Amino acid sequence: MNEKRMPLSAIETPAVIVNMDVLESNIAEMSRLAREAGVRLRPHTKIHECPDIAKLQIAGGACGIEVGAIERALCMAEAGIDDILIAHPFYGDHKLAILRRLLDKPGLKITVMADMIEQAEEISRVGQALGRAIPMLLKVNTGGDRFGVRPGEPAVRMAKRLCRLPGIAFQGIYVHESGGNPTPEGMDRLALEAATMAVQTARLLSKEGVPGAHVSVGASPTLRATCALLKGKRFPEITEIHPGHCTIGDMWHVRALANAREACAAAVLCTVMSAADPRHVVIDAGYKTFGADSLIQYQDMPGFFWQGKPSFGSVQGREDLWPGRISAETACVQYMEPDPAPAKRLRIGDRLEIVPNNATLTISMQEKIYGVRRGGVERIFTVAGRKDRTPAV
């Protein structure tokens, strides 16, 4: 242990901390599952937006990383990460300028995504101007109903059009499943349906003579179900998976079965500002720290409400506390027992660690994350992917 490291008590609150033991365990589990399934792991980094955590994932066995918006790729490339997949299709001059900037970096492999010919044609023009073929995947919608063309014949028709574009190197297809019932059986079913549609589409492409060896599927809630399918060699066409949130975990993904509660690595460290009311205490973090995601989509699950209120997180080590009233810069954490014993009462100045509902939102509002181990700060991570920190083109 480094005796000179910052003690946890020296961190100014509110702040986001990440338990290094839990983070490393999550990274190791993701890599192990992918390795046993015989596929590449390309974690989505939207949960942390941090190049140093991405490097830990690559050191743990990931083949590269994935980002959502193209802007998020800049900080990762600047940090020396050399294999980046941009998961969201993009369009417009500003986005293309960022693409050019990325393509100018020696040794950097950038793979882009499309689900419309209009996006691909713009990227094609960039590739032609640079005298190179830009790797591209076709995003296929297997039921998430966000980006993507439908699987089967619609995907085959679009893939053929992409293959005819100069300046494009068509690589294959990409699926990101979502939805499903938050039960083990529901996740098994969702994983099977997504893998089946992806592989059926890949087989159609091969039958039609369309080159495209890349077939990726995956999401955090279906990580274990997908890897179990692939470990059984049922879908040998699938080459890559791309879960993201289970690196860090949050209460959303506890409910979605992506993480156990103890596998949530991040928490908001906050301080009790007032204990004047016997029914609750007031902390120095509100929705400007936690975000405002109440996870209302899970309102029918048992324990979602207490006294008519949803929670904005879960207090570490205190199941008797309910963080259920939140405003801009403060929040109330309520005692669930009507008259708690003196030993259970919080005092002004006490600190709480609260696992947020949506860690992506929480981390995106921070400039740094404190990596802690055994009561001290082991390292400080920069949240370089924050939108307001993205370098200008």
Show the residue positions of the predicted features.
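Generic N-terminal amphipathic, Lys/Arg-enriched alpha-helix
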Residues: 1-18
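N-terminal glycine-rich anion-binding loops that anchor highly charged ligand groups
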Residues: 2-3, 22-53, 66
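Conserved, mostly hydrophobic/aromatic
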Residues: 23, 46, 76, 138, ...
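Active-site-proximal beta-alpha core segment in soluble small-molecule metabolic enzymes
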Residues: 44-182
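Active-site loop/helix belt of alpha/beta enzymes
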Residues: 135, 142-258
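Active-site loop ensemble at the mouth of alpha/beta enzyme cores that anchors a bound cofactor
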Residues: 223-308
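C-terminal accessory subdomain/extension
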Residues: 279, 283-393
